[in-house]
From Swiss-Prot:
Disulfide bonds: C102-C275, C199-C206, C252-C259, C364-C448, C385-C425, C385-C444, C389-C440, C398-C425, C398-C448, C400-C414
Taxonomic lineage from the root: Eukaryota, Metazoa, Chordata, Craniata, Vertebrata
Name listed for the protein in its UniProt record: Epithelial sodium channel subunit alpha
Transmembrane portions of the chain: 56-76, 532-552
Keywords, sorted A to Z: Cell membrane, Cell projection, Cilium, Cytoplasm, Cytoplasmic vesicle, Disulfide bond, Flagellum, Ion channel, Ion transport, Membrane, Sodium, Sodium channel, Sodium transport, Transmembrane, Transmembrane helix, Transport
Gene giving rise to this polypeptide: scnn1a
Gene Ontology cellular component annotations, sorted alphabetically: acrosomal vesicle; apical plasma membrane; cytoplasm; motile cilium; sodium channel complex
Task performed by this protein: This is one of the three pore-forming subunits of the heterotrimeric epithelial sodium channel (ENaC), a critical regulator of sodium balance and fluid homeostasis. ENaC operates in epithelial tissues, where it mediates the electrodiffusion of sodium ions from extracellular fluid through the apical membrane of cells, with water following osmotically.
Organism: Neoceratodus forsteri (Australian lungfish)
Tissue: Strongly expressed in gill, kidney and rectum (at protein level). More weakly expressed in muscle, brain, heart, liver and intestine.
Biased composition (Polar residues): 562-586
Membrane topology note: Multi-pass membrane protein
Catalyses which reaction(s): Na(+)(in) = Na(+)(out)
Stretches the record annotates as Disordered: 561-587
Subcellular location: Apical cell membrane; Cell projection, Cilium; Cytoplasmic granule; Cytoplasm
Length: 655
């Protein structure tokens, strides 16, 4: 039975197990008639109404485009990796943080007076020249009257000195020491700045480090000279001989229990001097708070005497305090809080734990992927990383390290004796560092997890006027120190949790893969009312489109080759003498068209009156019939007795 007969009998053509459609029209008709996507069948059922067909086609394509536009928005939102912040409040006992207090004075003046006497004397001369300053009229002792000023100065005053500058950074050639008929720029209405000149090693490239205030300029200039002096002194000699904690902390207790030597560690800060960290968690078990309130925290009585302060470097009286986590270094100059003399300062704390997402969700790190060597003995901290990065850059480009930062291995601090142009190099780098041109802030990302303490401070006069006498008397006898200035030499500090509720803030992905698929499914159902299997049908349609395209291309190529072969066959019938050569060329082209043509020379058939032959039928003994035609036998496999009528009806064989 032929295919047409099967189609006529069954009403539908039988589909093969693996087969494709012959044209795009058949493919789209089958898809529109059988798909579960809404609206597609309308395009086929309305094919006799062109207006409906066009309308439903436009509607389908428009809806399809809007849906995929929504898909694009959803994918854009997903790949932006948004996060949600979750806040929770918990109540439990709290580990007390580390508390660091510093004296606000790098050295007691009587300890370093020998090293700084010449610098202080020269500073007084500068003040006298620029501002007509006389320390004797202020009731202070002049540093130039000290016998320690004799000898060679430890700094090069001709290299860098304070100068008044106009808007063009031109030095003001103003009064000199002892001049009585000259005037200072500060008496003029014209604006002048004050600063000092910095040059490179050759002296060819120079710039002025200027300030609008003479106080700021003098402190920065003095600090620069102070570094040049102290950096030349071995670190062992820099240790103050009078470094007992009792000279700074008169009393200490936590939860109404006295502190011990195991509860604190000491270190020296280059600007703030002796610093003591309580509850650092290294030498003893960390403190814990079970009850909130000012009476259940850390209480310190501090000495804040100002008589032994460095006059040109320590311009603030009191002490400095910083509350920080145990595994973080104290950066007193960045986050500290000053304590006033004669005042009781109460600092209430509330703990916060922050947890961020890294990777594609945020630019945070745990420090393992940071390429900056941490110069601080602590866990990863952004401030420590930034300072370490800046110090490494200074060492690399200036050949020495900045005195206020820890040193990398094998480096030494900058000073005139080691690098005369280090100031020029440092201030140039600092400007680039502040503008983030060195890349330190980009390299040092914020940590993914850290603990923060929100603080509120309250102040009150301490001791009061009626209790000042007996409190200072007791403190003087207990610490064997004569307090001549009363409450101006002492201060009290309280650090406590004002509540044991602590807040946890965490980030979580707000648009996950599940959310994306859910939203895309909602959009698909909204615009087409379909399911996941409908998406599979769309994928099948795309695959069939590709397959039909390949079939159509191969069919066209075959037809082109067939047309070429037919034209060459006609040429063969008229050029018999060259048949051999043409057959060879045709064979080459037929191979390219995936066809083989066999050409044979045959003799013309004999002329007969009729093509009907009467051939006797011979039956074999086994009841098989044999017909003899042109000396060739054709065997019939069916028994003769079973089909007599059929054999008779067949009649003669026609060739």
């Amino acid at each position: 039975m032929t295919d047409k007969e099967e189609e006529a009998e069954g009403g539908k053509k039988k589909e093969p197990m693996i087969g494709f459609y012959d044209s795009y029209q058949e493919l789209f008709e089958f898809f529109c008639n059988n798909t579960t996507i809404h609206g597609t069948i309308r395009m086929v059922c309305s094919k006799h109404n062109n207006m409906k067909t066009v309308s439903w086609t436009i509607l389908f394509i428009t809806t399809f485009g809007v849906m995929y536009w929504q898909f694009g928005l959803l994918l854009g939102q997903y790949y932006s990796y948004p996060v949600s912040i979750t806040m929770s409040v918990n109540f439990d006992k709290l580990i007390f943080p580390a508390v660091t207090v510093c004296t606000l004075n790098p050295y007691r003046y009587n300890v370093v007076s020998t090293q700084l006497a010449n610098l202080d004397c020269y500073t007084e001369e500068l003040l006298s020249t620029l501002y007509h300053y006389n320390p004797l009229t202020s009731g202070n002792q002049s540093a130039c009257n000290s016998s320690s000023t004799a000898g060679t100065r430890a700094f090069d005053e001709s290299y860098m000195k304070l100068e008044f500058l106009n808007d063009e950074n031109t030095a003001y050639s103003g009064p000199v020491k002892g001049a009585t008929n000259s005037t200072s720029p500060v008496n003029h209405t014209e604006f002048y700045r004050i600063g000092f000149k910095l040059c490179n090693a050759t002296g060819e490239d120079c710039f002025y480090q200027t300030y609008s205030s003479g106080v700021d300029a003098l402190r920065e200039w003095y600090k620069f000279q102070y570094i040049n002096i102290m950096a030349q002194i071995p670190s062992q000699s820099n240790q103050e001989d009078d470094s007992q904690i009792s000279n700074f902390v008169y009393a200490c207790e936590f939860n109404k229990v006295s502190c011990g030597v195991e509860n604190y560690t000491r270190f020296r800060h280059p600007v703030y001097g002796n610093c003591y960290t309580y509850n650092d968690g290294q030498s003893a078990t960390p403190w814990a708070s079970f009850v909130p309130g000012v009476g259940n925290g850390l209480s310190l009585v501090l000495r804040t005497e100002q008589n032994d302060f460095l006059p040109f470097l320590s311009t603030v009286a009191g002490a400095r305090v910083l509350v920080h986590d145990q595994n973080q270094p104290p950066f007193m100059e960045d986050s500290g809080l000053d304590i006033r003399p004669g005042v009781e300062t109460s600092i209430g704390m509330k703990k916060e734990i922050i947890s961020r997402l890294g990777g594609v969700y945020g630019n945070c790190t745990d420090g393992s992927d940071i390429d900056v060597v941490n110069l601080y003995n602590s866990d990863y901290n952004q401030q420590a990383c930034v300072r370490s990065c800046f110090q490494a850059t200074i060492v690399q480009q200036c050949g020495c390290g900045y005195y206020f930062y820890p040193l990398p291995s094998g480096a030494e601090y900058c000073s005139y004796s080691r690098n005369k142009s280090w100031g020029y190099c440092y201030y140039k780098l600092y400007k680039a560092f502040a503008a983030d041109e060195l890349g330190c802030f980009r390299r040092c990302r914020k940590p993914c997890q850290y603990t923060d303490y929100k603080m509120t401070a309250g102040y009150a006069q301490w001791p009061s006027s009626v209790s000042e006498s007996w409190i200072t008397s007791i403190l003087s006898q207990e610490n064997q120190y004569n307090m001549t200035s009363g409450r101006k030499n002492i201060a009290k500090l309280n650090v406590y949790f004002y509540e044991l509720n602590y807040q946890t803030m965490g980030e979580s992905p707000s648009f996950t893969v599940v959310t994306l698929l859910s939203n895309m499914g909602s959009q698909w159902s909204l615009w087409f009312g379909s399911s996941v299997l409908s998406v599979v049908e769309m994928g099948e349609l795309v695959f069939d489109l590709i397959a039909v395209g390949v079939i159509v291309l191969r069919r066209r190529r075959r037809e082109k080759c067939q047309a070429s072969s037919d034209g060459e066959g006609t040429s063969d019938s008229t050029a018999g003498t060259h048949r051999g050569q043409e057959n060879a060329s045709r064979s080459g082209r037929d191979v390219a068209c995936n066809r083989f043509v066999v050409v044979a020379e045959i003799s013309p058939p004999p002329a007969y009156d009729t093509l009907q032959l009467d051939v006797p039928v011979a039956c074999a003994p086994d009841c098989e019939c044999t017909q003899h035609v042109s000396h060739a036998s054709v065997h019939s496999q069916a028994p003769c007795s079973s089909q007599p009528e059929q054999e008779a009806s067949e009649g003669p064989t026609v060739l």
